Amino acid sequence: TADFSPLSREKFEAYIGKKVAKFPEDIFVWKKNTDGKFITQPGKYFQKWMEWRTKNITDFMALARKEVKAANPKVSFGTYTGAWYPSYYEVGVNFASKKYDPAKDFSWATPEYKNYGYAELIDLYATGNYYTDITIEEYKKTNRNIWNETDSQAQAGTWYCVEGSCQHLRQILKDNKFMGGILVDQFYDNPGKLSETIEMNLRRSDGLMVFDIVHII
C-alpha cells in the first residue's frame, strides 16, 4: 500500500470515485524545508489516501485471520507494531479499536479512518515501547524528541515514554489487550533502567515482549 504505481492510482481512484488530476502531487510530495530537510507536503487527497492505505491493511488482516482460523481455530492470530500511533498512519496501519475515533485527536485522520481499526481482529498483540524515559514525569523533564524508524520526522509528547505510551494505548485499544515491548540494547549501559522498563510494561500493559531475546541469551 506504499507505492504510487499505476495500479495503486487506479484502485485509489475507484475507492474515492473520482480521477486524481495530479498524481502523486494531490496525495503528497517530498519538499525541503528551511533547514534543508525533506518533509511531506500533503495534497488535497492526503487524508483519503491514508484512509485507503489502512483499509487495505485491515482488509488483509481480516483475510489472514480467516485463513488461520480455518486451518486451526485454536491458534492465536496476532501481530506486532510499533507503539507510536500518532505517526503510525505513515505506514498504513491502524492497530486501534474501531471504537476509537482518531479524527478527534489527529488532523491526518478522516471521520471514516476509525472504521479500519483492526484491534478486534487479533488475539495476541505486542507493541514496541522502545523509550529510555520510563515515567511521564521523567519524560516531562527531558522533553526529548523521538525519531522512530518508521517516522518521517521527529515526534514529541507523552506518547514517547513507557508509562505514557501504555496509558495512551489503553485509550485507543479500548478493551483489547496488549503486551508492551522492550528494546534490550537501549539499556546495555544502564541495566537499572532495563529493570524499570520491564516493571513498567508489566504493570501498565498485559504482558511483556523482549526484543530481541537473542540479545541477552
Language-model segments: residues:
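Polysaccharide-binding and catalytic clefts of secreted carbohydrate-active enzymes
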Residues: 1-133, 137-138, 142-143
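Substrate-binding cleft of secreted/luminal carbohydrate-active enzymes
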Residues: 113-217
